[in-house]
Amino acid sequence: MSMSDPLGDMLTRIRNALARKKGKLVTPASKLRACVLDVLQSEGYIRGYNQVDLGDGKSEIEIELKYFEGLAAIRELSRVSKPGRRVYVSAKSLPQVANGLGVSILSTPKGIMADHEAREQNVGGELLCRVF
C-alpha cells in the first residue's frame, strides 16, 4: 500500500508517541523526513534521530523524543500544507507560531528550514508544518 502523505504520517507517529509518553519511535526513512527532523533537533524539540539501514534498500529512522520534568517538549504539532491543498507563503507573509514561541517548518528553494531562518534569508516556500 502506498502512503499519500509520508510527512503527515511521521508527524502523527510523533504525536501518538508523545501522548503515550514513549521515549523513542520508529518511522520509515526518507530525505524529507530527515530534513524536517534536522530542523526539529536544531530547534530543541527532539533529542535526536538515527537512520538504521534494514538492507534491501530500505531504512528506518529511530527518533528519540524530548521531555522536561515529565512534559513533552512538543505541545502541538500540526501539518499545514497537505497533498490535496498546498500552502505557499512569501518571506514577508510568514506567520508566527504562538507569538514567536513556536516554529514553522518550510520547504524552500534553499532547503528545509525554520521560519526565522527563512526570514533572515528572505525566502518563502511551502509551509510544511507548525511546532509549538
Curated annotation (Swiss-Prot):
A Gene Ontology molecular function term of the record: rRNA binding
Keywords assigned: Ribonucleoprotein, Ribosomal protein, RNA-binding, rRNA-binding
Gene3D superfamilies membership: 3.30.1370.30, 3.30.1490.10
GO biological process, one term: translation
InterPro entries xref list: Ribosomal_uS8 (IPR000630), Ribosomal_uS8_CS (IPR047863), Ribosomal_uS8_sf (IPR035987)
One Pfam family in the UniProt entry: Ribosomal_S8
Family annotation (PROSITE patterns): RIBOSOMAL_S8
PANTHER family reported for this sequence: 40S RIBOSOMAL PROTEIN S15A (PTHR11758)
Family statement drawn from the similarity comment of this UniProt entry: Belongs to the universal ribosomal protein uS8 family.
Subunit structure: Part of the 30S ribosomal subunit. Contacts proteins S5 and S12.
Protein purpose: One of the primary rRNA binding proteins, it binds directly to 16S rRNA central domain where it helps coordinate assembly of the platform of the 30S subunit.
Official protein name in the record: Small ribosomal subunit protein uS8
Species the sequence originates in: Bartonella quintana (strain Toulouse)
Taxonomic lineage of the native organism: Bacteria, Pseudomonadati, Pseudomonadota, Alphaproteobacteria, Hyphomicrobiales
